[in-house]
Amino acid sequence: RSSDLFEYLVERMSWLLGEHAVDYVKWDMNRELVQPGHKGKAAADAQTRQFYRLLDVLGERFPHIEFESCSSGGGRIDYEVLTRCHRFWASDNNDALERNTIQRGMSYFFPPEVMGAHIGHHKCHATFRQHSIQFRGLTALFGHMGLELDPLTVDAQEREGYRHYAALHKRWREVIHHGTQWRVDMPDTTTLAQGIVSEDKTQGLFLVSQLAMPDYTLMMPLRMPGLDASALYRITLLDHPNIQITGEGGHTMRKLPSWMEAPQTVSGEW
C-alpha cells in the first residue's frame, strides 16, 4: 500500500539523516516518466505530491539539512518543490561548454541562487571534452557554486584554481544572489553574454563566453544593461581563460577588445 511505502521511506530516511553527519542531500532521479498513468489514475501526479509530503516531514525533522532537487527525467524543476528545497541541479551534463546554454535557459525561469553550478573534472564524464580550470570556474561562477569532483585526484594547479574561483564567487556572491540578472543579446550567435547588477547599481559583474568560432573577425561592441544612466563606471577585467593573442603566434581574429587589454571608464547610459 502507498501509505505503508510512505511510512517506510520516512523511517529509513530519518534513520539515515539522524544517525549520520549529513548536511546536504541531492535528491536525484535519472529516469524518464515512462508510466505517468497507472490503472486509469494520474500516478505521476500522486507520486509528486507524496514526494512533497515526504520533504515536508524530513524538513521539519531535520531543518539544518539542505536539499537539492533534480532536473533530470522529465524536467522536475518546478516552483512548488522550491518551497521545500534550497536549489536545483540543472543537468548531469557538467561540461562547461554545454553548461553555458543550459544555465542560460534556466535563467529565464529561476534566479542564480537556486541554480546548482559546479566546477567539474577537467575531463567531463558526459562528453569527454577537456576544459581549462578558468573556463570551468567562470562558467560555474554565476549560480549556487560548488565542486563536483574528487579534489584528492588532481594536481596542485587544479586545486589552486578551485581556491581561486571559490574565493571569487564568495567575493561577488552578494551581487550574484541578490542583484538584478540581465541576459545580453549579442550580434554574434556564437557569443553568450550575461550580467548581474547590484541593487543600488553601483557595481555589476558580467560574463562573456565565446562558445565557437566567431562569425565576425572582430568582437562586436558589448552593451551592459541595467546600470545607472547618470553614472560613470570603471570596467575592469577580473578573470579570463588563457588566450593566445596576436603577436604570440595568433591571428587577427584573436585580437582582444579594448576592455580586455586595459581598464575603461564608460557611461552607464544604455
Predicted regions and their residues:
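Conserved, mostly hydrophobic/aromatic
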Residues: 28, 67, 140, 206, ...
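Glycan-recognition surfaces
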Residues: 1-7, 11, 18, 48-49, ...
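Active-site groove signature of glycoside hydrolases
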Residues: 8-40
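Catalytic cores of secreted or luminal carbohydrate-active enzymes
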Residues: 131-185
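C-terminal beta-sandwich/jelly-roll accessory domains of carbohydrate-active enzymes
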Residues: 212-270
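Flexible loop/turn segments at secondary-structure boundaries
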Residues: 31-36, 74-79, 123-127, 148-150, ...
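Generic beta-strand/beta-sheet core signal
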Residues: 25-30, 68-72, 209
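Carbohydrate-binding surface patches
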Residues: 186-229
